[in-house]
Amino acid sequence: MNISIISVGKIKEKFLKAAIDEYSKRLSKYCKLNIIEVTDEKTPDNASLKEENIIKDKEGNLILKHIKDNSFVIALDLKGKSITSEEFSGLIENCRLTGNSTIAFVIGGSLGLSEQVLSRANYKLSFSKMTFPHQLFRVMLLEQVYRAFRILCGEPYHK
């Protein structure tokens, strides 16, 4: 299975890079992982709604360029569905069983995802009603993908 994580912005913090590297290494046993970072647009202070939408559209166009036609796209969105880790593993397994060998997870920037990206998504997922820094969220997503594969393989993993 091929897993892509397409995210706005670059990781600068060493501790986050180390965590991403660790989960990437762990996941190599289960899938081919591709992490893609697209450029984040600078948001001016006191940006209008129109300016924010323009920024989201620019970031969205960069994201869409990296989504393959055959990808099952999971957009991480505050308005998405909240599910358990077991349900998440079932979602990944269902992709595999229905012939979707490529899953693209999409993480927006500080303003979220554009309507075009949300429209392309096959599934909208929310981890919480809380807002997280998108850099930290990559680690959280990788941990849950790793946990999902452990669940699917019937392997133990701490709770």
Swiss-Prot record:
Keyword rRNA processing: yes
Catalytic activities: pseudouridine(1915) in 23S rRNA + S-adenosyl-L-methionine = N(3)-methylpseudouridine(1915) in 23S rRNA + S-adenosyl-L-homocysteine + H(+)
GO CC annotations on file: cytoplasm
Transmembrane segments: none
Residue numbers binding S-adenosyl-L-methionine: L76, G108, F127, S128, K129, M130, T131, F132
Pfam families given in the database record: SPOUT_MTase (PF02590)
Domain of life: Bacteria
Alphabetically ordered keywords of this record: Cytoplasm, Methyltransferase, rRNA processing, S-adenosyl-L-methionine, Transferase
Cell location: Cytoplasm
InterPro entries noted in UniProt: Alpha/beta_knot_MTases, RlmH-like, tRNA_m1G_MTases_N
Any GO MF annotation of the entry: rRNA (pseudouridine-N3-)-methyltransferase activity
UniProt xrefs under HAMAP family: 23SrRNA_methyltr_H
Function, as annotated: Specifically methylates the pseudouridine at position 1915 (m3Psi1915) in 23S rRNA.
Binding partners and assembly: Homodimer.
Family named by the database record: Belongs to the RNA methyltransferase RlmH family.
Protein name: Ribosomal RNA large subunit methyltransferase H
Native species: Clostridium botulinum (strain Langeland / NCTC 10281 / Type F)
Gene this chain is encoded by: rlmH
